[in-house]
Amino acid sequence: MPRYFFNARIADELISDPEGEVLRNPDRAWEMARAMIRELLKTEGVDERLLNATIEVTDDEGGIVLEFPFAEALLDAEDESRTKH
């Protein structure tokens, strides 16, 4: 299974994930990125710097697999909290 690295880009700073996670596919990496962002926003609070940040998920070779904006994870959480009939 491939290894994915979850690097945080906050303004001009890139915080690299040196270890990564072995996951079955990019869909699972997307789910993990969303969960990481939500947890960070829950513990750190929502501020403008974080709302403009992204998680860059890369593969073993450093290629970007996906970019997940923090704001998108927050909006996604609001949609899930609504009652659906």
Describe the predicted segments one by one.
Residues 1-16:
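Short aromatic-glycine-(Arg/Gly/Cys) micro-motifs in beta-strand/loop hairpins
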Residues 15-24:
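A short, exposed loop/beta-hairpin motif centered on an aromatic-Gly-Thr core
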